[in-house]
Amino acid sequence: MADLKAILDSIYTDILPRVGEGKVADYIPELAKVDPRQFGMAIVTVDGKVYRVGDADIAFSIQSISKVFMLTLALGKVGEGLWKRVGREPSGSAFNSIVQLEHESGIPRNPFINAGAIAVTDVVMAGHAPREAIGELLRFVRYLADDESITIDDKVARSETQTGYRNVALANFMRAYRNLDHPVDHVLGVYFHQCALSMSCEQLARAGLFLAARGSNPMTGHSVVSPKRARRINALMLTCGHYDGSGDFAYHVGLPGKSGVGGGIFAVAPGIASIAVWSPGLNKVGNSQLGAVALEMLAARTGWSVFGD
């Protein structure tokens, strides 16, 4: 394997002069307070080695990256039946598009846009009170990362609850089309809390390692999903994981990944490693500007792109 420490150090050196680029997600008041002049990156390999640079131990709001973990839970509960509620195609529209949802009769295009993630959350809630569903997700992520210190930032959750008007509209559209089984306020309460998960790059890379290792976490010995399901979650991340910037990310980076407006990106090099990068400044489609640049550098310097070196 390439000398990952040297490669990661070289990426950090090249990124450092640009730290602060992009614009923080100011439409969520708590995220607007985050200092954009931060950058961290962590790599966890399938043989258990951990590499990190910069602010890799600072917890940040993972936001939409949480959708990967919620999707994993939902597939565990209902399997392929999930795809009656949500599609598997790239959206080509903004992550919070209302027009597309109405045009497609309340069936969200994929589980990683906001409407799709809200539908997935509704599935996970079956038989649970909202507080129980939030607890289930938190326990699951702690189990994946083998880290009981992971928390949900209640200030961020409240901030989203107070300003998430488009998400309220999306949920009401789906409820009108009978694609939500639970009351809108209950589903959104869970959704806003899942997006407020607070994790560091290292914690996030550890939690997602099962997707790099055929569904099992080699560091903990935990079997999480089947190899087939891991492969399919990775496929969805590659095609849909970066909103309407997914094609561009595949073109430049060539790895399955999921971004969040907190500035994080989680990525997978199948059979090799899981990667998490964080830089709060976003590009025009809501993905971490320097996070994407750093991952492009990583793919180029390691040859890890799924499309070849």
Curated annotation (Swiss-Prot):
UniProt: substrate binding residues: S64, N114, E160, N167, Y191, Y243, V261
Keyword Transmembrane helix on entry: no
Gene3D superfamilies: DD-peptidase/beta-lactamase superfamily (3.40.710.10)
Biological processes annotated in GO: glutamate biosynthetic process; glutamine catabolic process
Keywords: Hydrolase
Gene Ontology molecular functions: glutaminase activity
Enzyme class of the recorded protein, top EC level: hydrolase
Catalytic activity line of the entry: L-glutamine + H2O = L-glutamate + NH4(+)
Pfam families, per the entry: Glutaminase
EC number: 3.5.1.2
Name recorded for this polypeptide: Glutaminase
Subunit structure: Homotetramer.
Gene field: glsA
Family to which this protein belongs: Belongs to the glutaminase family.
InterPro entries membership: Beta-lactam/transpept-like, Glutaminase
Keyword Hydrolase attached: yes
